[in-house]
Amino acid sequence: SKKLAMILPVGPMGMYKWAVFFIKEWNVSCDHVTTFNMDEWADSEGNTLPNTDPASFENSMNNAFFDRLGELTVPPEQRNFATKENLPTYPEKIAKLKSEGARLVLVFGIGRMCHIAFWEPQFAEEYSSEQEWKKECYRLGAKLHPLTIEQNAITSFKSRTTLVPCTANTIGPGLFLQADYII
């Protein structure tokens, strides 16, 4: 029942099937968990799709994970998605949880272009030092690398590159480097 903060990717979706299975099998309530989705498709201004749109990450997470947990699920008010309004609140919310004793777990993979979330390697060129880069907590309307777009076309858009958004909201190293544990 200790507080737990988790930064989650939207995929691979298969891992959520197993998480749901074990949470239900072991009858573990997630009422002590607060989640932060690491990214979301957005336009260059950071505006995201409605959460009811089948292409939105929030919709995907609700369908594949939260809704399937039933009464054991993470309470809706403890689910955070990378919208223009909510992503800037992540640093403060995570800091508060950690000050209350929560552990921060980061679940991630490294993309083909060596990105974590949609934090692309070419962003480093914009910072004068590594320390400055490490402080950046998020980016709204981040421009994605062409190989990231290609990777997402293959994995999520049936290889239709023109359907993949070129920008997204994403967490940055100022958040993912705070993790107490990584998976």
Task: Report the location of each language-model feature.
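Glycine-rich phosphate-binding loop
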Residues: S99-E126
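Short glycine-rich or small-residue beta-strand-to-loop segments that form or flank ligand, phosphate
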Residues: A5-V10, F36, I182-I183
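Ligand-binding beta-strand-loop-alpha-helix segment within the catalytic cores
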Residues: V28-V107, T162-L163
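N-terminal glycine-/serine-/threonine-rich phosphate-binding loop
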Residues: S1-M6, K24
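Class I SAM-dependent methyltransferase SAM-binding "motif I" and its flanking Rossmann-like core
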Residues: A117-T167
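C-terminal functional extensions of proteins
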Residues: T162-I183
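Glycine-rich beta-strand-to-loop/alpha-helix junction loops that act as flexible
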Residues: L8-M13, F108-R112
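A glycine- and small-aliphatic-rich helix-loop capping segment at beta-alpha/alpha-beta transitions
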Residues: V20-C30, T52, P121-Q131
